[in-house]
Amino acid sequence: MKTFEYYKLDIGSSHESILNSIDFGGATKNTKPNLNIGDAVFSKVLSINKFNNTYLTCKSEESKKTWSTGESTFGLLNGGRIYEYNRNYSWILMDNNKIIERLKDFCEFELCIGMNGKIWIKSEKIEDNNKIYKSIIMSFEKNNEEMERYLNKLFNKI
């Protein structure tokens, strides 16, 4: 029986990032997620101590959904793929980004944008994951009209 009290996660920092094993919505000492090496986790920063170690949480004040249902806001990300992007664009992506709304017209997908320069994308087709990622990256350089042409061509909707 595994009795891990915490996980060390790589969030792209030079310091440790620690996630308590019961810091998931609805988790207890007896019922908690079992993360494995290589698992992708959507979490948020809870605090940073004086040694610059980052403490993470997968609990959400806004949602009462638990990790065990798979419906919680934060937690283990199943399937999909992680891509990297320039973290300087984090706020642009998170703050009313039109490209993400527009992409919904071309395919169904799930998306998690990290402030650490990581983006997780999950769609039914692997090639759509790549198209979504390319579209998001291209949106930093193109205006709305150029993006519309690009999306139609990329998703063969001309």
Whereabouts are the PLM-identified features?
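Single-stranded RNA-binding regions, centering on S1/OB-family and related RNA-binding modules
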Residues: 2-44, 48-158
